[in-house]
Amino acid sequence: MVKPLPRLRLQGFNNLTKALSFNIYDVCYARTEEERQRYIEYIDEQYDADRLTQILTDVAEIIGANILNIARQDYDPQGASVTILISEEPVIDKKQAGRELISDAVVAHMDKSHITVHTYPETHPQEGIATFRADIDVATCGVISPLKALNYLIETLESDIVIMDYRVRGFTRDVKGKKHYIDHKINSIQHFLAKNVKSRYEMIDVNVYQENIFHTKMHLKDFDLDQYLFEERAKNLSFKERMKIETLLKREIEELFHGRNLSE
């Protein structure tokens, strides 16, 4: 739960911009080129523009935002993008949320709050590794907090690795003229995660408190090879094959988690 500071009487609108950025990775091993292609097709179908639109619509509801406009696109050969413009004030009936075009007037709100997602499926050309990355941004202007959507996004996208950034920009002025650069308490993004989420992940923080920048990296603690194999079971592989695949997968996870290639 987001803990607000003592309620402020503001001079006008709350001008703070709060932005939560996610990079969520799913890692998989597919033995043959044909299996890797089927993995890409599977991911492309599971996370097409329609499904992503529903996920982001749920996010808008969770954070208490109202939908202004939705733009979505599936790409060839793979990938999808969805952008939803949101506001604090009611604009349309929720039953209309699935319509792409609401009104030309929503262009005026494009510098305000929005939720976006882009997907990036890819495969290694030789080693059988396939990954899926979802890049999600939730940016709000005013009292709405994107942190409320943390647990829903992590659970919904079944994440192996999560890289999160949260930052607060701008200021809001109270009735006495004093500027406030943040309107809620936060020491770490981890404090906003549910217990069942925290129990499953190894996490590290890199925070710059004086700049209101918070960064958390997470990866699953437990490694179950079957969870990473596509169209295959570990019991059908030889011990040597299992060890080779496990080494490849763990290396891939470590490199994505740290954001750099490890030396041989």
Swiss-Prot record:
Q: What Gene3D superfamilies has UniProt attached to this entry?
A: S-adenosylmethionine decarboxylase
Q: Which organism is it from?
A: Xanthomonas oryzae pv. oryzae (strain KACC10331 / KXO85)
- NCBIfam families assigned to the protein according to its UniProt record, in alphabetical order: SAM_DCase_Eco
- GO CC annotation: what is one? cytosol
Q: Which PANTHER family match?
A: S-ADENOSYLMETHIONINE DECARBOXYLASE PROENZYME
**Biological process (GO), any one:** spermidine biosynthetic process
Instruction: Pinpoint the site Cleavage (non-hydrolytic).
Output: 112-113
This protein is called S-adenosylmethionine decarboxylase proenzyme
What's the stated role of this polypeptide?
Catalyzes the decarboxylation of S-adenosylmethionine to S-adenosylmethioninamine (dcAdoMet), the propylamine donor required for the synthesis of the polyamines spermine and spermidine from the diamine putrescine.
**Residues modified to Pyruvic acid (Ser):** 113
Q: Which cysteines are joined by disulfide bonds?
A: none
